[in-house]
Each structure stands twice: as C-alpha cells, then as structure tokens.
Amino acid sequence: VKSSEYKYNYFYDGSANPGILKLKKGQKFANVFTAKKGSAKKKELIKAVNLVTWSANVKYSIQIYRNPKDGRPTSGTKMLKRPVTGTIREAGTHTIDLPRKAEVLRGDKFAVVVKLRSSGKIGFDENDDYHWVSFVNKTKKGQSYLYDHRKWNDLNPDHATVRLKAYTVMQPVNKIHLRYCKADSKNKNPKGIVLYYKGKHLKKNKDYKIVKKEGYKYVIVKGRGRYRGTKKIYLKTK
C-alpha cells in the first residue's frame, strides 16, 4: 500500500501466521476500531478496506457502521449509502477503495463488516506453535468478530482476529465540527445549554441551532456558519 494514497492503517492482525478460515455463503466477519486522528482542522476519512482471501472468486459485500453497541458490529449507523459489492478473482491480499469516503470523528468507534455472498476462505491471525516457529497474536475483547448465521461471536477468547483493515486519509476543513466543541447544560431546560470552542462561547442561531428536543433528556444541535455537523447534549436533571 502506497503511503501517498493512504495516511493511516487500522488493523489488529500483527503476526505472520498464515491462518485460514473457511466461511459459508452469508457469513460475516468484522473488526471494530476507534478513530484517532480527526481534529477541528482536519477530518479523517475512511478511503479503503483491505482483506485477505485464500480462495478464488469470493463474492463480498462491505458496509461500515458508526458507533455500534458492544458485541454487535452491525448495530451502529450505516456509513455507506449502499454496501460495496464485488468479486475477488484471485487469492491474496486485496485493497478495495470505497466509491465515497466516510468520515469518522476522533473517538468514534466504527465497524468494518464484510458479508460473503459466496463460500470462501479468508485470512485470520491467532496464537499458534509449529515447534519450529510460533506466532503470538495479542487481542482484546471487542476487536474482532465472526457471525455464524445466528449471532456475533467475539474472537478474543481464541486470541484470534480476522485480517481486515481500514485505510484512512486526512483532509483539511474550514468548518469546525460541533463534536470537537465542549458543551454544558446549566439545568434541564434546553435554553440553558452552553457551547464553546477553545474558551469561546458559540452563539445560538449564528453558530448553531437546536434541531431536536427530547423532553428534558437531551437536545440535538446543528452547526451553522463556521461550524458543521450535529451534537447531542444531555441536560442536567438536578
């Protein structure tokens, strides 16, 4: 992968173990990452997905989900308008560019999910000892998953991860995302919310507007002028 094409690489498979996982049509595998590089001045965009196959003519469907719930990679918000589909003709390592880049904000979790539209063999990493060589794959809970037609299974107990990566790039922006602004609510009244960026208070209706109120629980605000995006602000109950 050329560093000039992609800036950052999200992955978990750290060893050279040539593990092979046989999957049936309809099975899914996923990795959940935490975005680390976005800022108020530069946005981080997922540009491509990389995966390993050990068989030919593997049909796939790729979707990315923002902030999925623990243990359920597909429970988040879909980030691609439609899944990216195709057929991998030969075994090997493959980089698949997305037709449209997907932005992830610093601190967001995002799940890269691949569904096989045909049976196939994919690459995965795990602890292994062949006597003449051994492999150690350090894993944590909530990183890599396999779907068996019924439920998602965390691969951490087996010290395994699927060989699935996300490549991102950085792009300058002239508007600050509200997620990078701090917020406070003085009370349970939506009128009491305060937004500020680097100590500067944002002005309602000039820098942001309230687009949704959920009783006295929270409000959703949307950026205006020099500010972009939306932010959910929970109201104080006491």
Place the predicted regions along the sequence by residue:
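Exposed aromatic-hydrophobic patches
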Residues: 93-101
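Short hydrophobic alpha-helix segments
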Residues: 82-83, 205
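Short loop/turn segments at connectors of secondary-structure elements within structured domains
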Residues: 45, 56-59, 90, 106, ...
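Short proline/glycine- and polar residue-rich coil/turn motifs
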Residues: 84-92, 104
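Short beta-strand and strand-turn-strand segments in soluble, beta-rich domains
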Residues: 73-82
